[in-house]
Design a protein with these regions (language model features):
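Bacterial N-terminal signal peptides
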Residues: 7-15
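Beta-rich carbohydrate-recognition and catalytic domains
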Residues: 18-139, 147-266, 275-339, 353-381
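Short glycine-rich, acidic/polar surface loops and turns
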Residues: 334-336, 344-347
Length: 381
């Protein structure tokens, strides 16, 4: 497969609409930060790998056939099973106009090479006649992230959207096609203190073991990073019931938050599952740029991707953070659709055949992939 390098750890082409953008040469920041996972490059001529199509299924909520992925397909999770990459992507029907006004469902696609996708005709997670209608009717199930335990249990963290409040929810599966919903991630924490908290974007800590990224622990507990306007953390004994980490004032502990003058000046939203390496814990995240107080190298409201290094023994301690994005909008389909200011929204990371495949949403409209050939940094020792 012929690959065209388009982004190092930082930098994009000014010719693609980003004035004053850094060049594609390896930057000093990349050279100084040997913990950064990458570089990632887009395979030439293959993206987007998932686009909308008029597939129909019977919707138990609407009690009729609906074209469940007709409008947009984006924000994908990714993992591997039986030698294939599995991509679980958010799909929107055409029931309304405007961001957040349609119904979202999670679709399934599989690939032997990470590029050519075989898709299921029906979604695998959606608003159903179940005990969770108050959580995901009518907005649906959004923005999945998926990680796997060593014994083959897949855990999905997704946003349950009832059009009143977005909340982080949990589902599990053994085959990635049949999912069991468990409800809100923070439902049992602190006597229900965070039941109605607006929360989303959960990234469970993983590590590379053999040929698979698997869920890891810190001090005997599972760990996830979560959040949109800031990055927080939570721990769990069972991967279903999660307890947000609190600070000395008994408030949510902020690990990072937006920075003036940077690409992440409006939002810092968790990306794919975090990864333990020999350098510590690497968290990839999505940053939104402010037009007034952000980085002038990137358009206002553009979504770019950053990386953060945390201490492997003290996972709430920040050791380093990139000042520039390692991945940013470049292709036309990343700068058109629902977010015309430009969006690469990373959510899925899969280790497959000695490469890393990073799946991302393009302007809330398509799914694309970038590839990293250098996976030595994933080694724990």
């Amino acid at each position: 497969m012929k690959l065209k390098f388009i982004i190092g750890v930082v930098g994009i082409l000014s010719a693609c609409g980003f004035t004053n953008a850094p060049s594609l040469d390896t930057t000093q920041e990349e050279q100084d930060n040997n913990w950064v996972i990458g570089p990632f490059h887009r395979p030439e001529g293959v993206n987007p790998v998932i686009s909308p199509q008029p597939t129909e299924f019977y919707c138990p909520m609407r009690k009729q056939q609906v074209k469940w992925e007709e409008s947009d397909t984006f924000n994908p999770a990714a993992t591997t099973k039986d030698g294939k990459i599995i991509v679980l992507y958010r799909a929107e029907d055409n029931s309304a106009q405007g961001i957040g006004k349609r119904t979202s469902r999670v679709g399934y696609a599989e690939s032997k090479d990470g590029i050519e996708m075989k898709r299921m005709a029906s979604p695998v997670l959606f608003p159903a006649e179940d005990n969770f209608k108050d959580q995901d009717w009518p907005g649906g199930c959004e923005d999945p992230r998926v990680a796997m335990t060593e014994d083959g249990l897949y855990v999905m963290l997704y946003t349950a959207w009832n059009r009143k409040k977005a909340r982080l929810a949990v589902a599990t599966s053994r085959d990635l096609k049949n999912w069991k919903k468990h409800g809100l991630a923070f439902d049992k924490a602190y006597n229900g203190r965070f039941n109605n908290l607006f929360c989303k974007s959960g990234s469970i800590l993983t590590k590379l073991k053999g040929n698979q990224l698997v869920i890891d622990k810190v001090d005997g507990k599972y760990l996830m990073y979560w959040g949109e306007y800031a990055v927080y953390a939570a721990t769990s004994d069972n991967l279903i019931d999660w307890y947000p980490v609190l600070d000395e004032k008994n408030e949510l502990m902020k690990i990072i938050q937006p920075r003036k003058g940077h690409f992440d000046s409006l939002l810092t939203e968790c990306g794919p599952p975090a990864v333990r390496t020999k350098h510590g814990i690497v968290l990839m995240y999505n940053g939104k740029n402010s037009g007034k107080t952000g980085d002038a190298d990137y358009p206002a409201n553009a979504y770019c991707a950053g990386q953060l290094l945390l201490d492997g023994d003290d996972p709430y301690k920040v050791l380093d953070r990139l000042d520039k994005p390692f991945f940013a909008p470049e292709a036309p389909f990343e700068k058109s659709g629902q977010y015309k200011d430009g969006t690469v929204f990373i959510e899925g990371l899969a280790y497959h055949k000695r490469k890393l495949y990073l799946y991302y949403g393009c302007a809330d409209s398509r799914v694309a992939v970038a590839v990293c050939d250098d996976v030595k940094k994933l080694k724990i020792k």
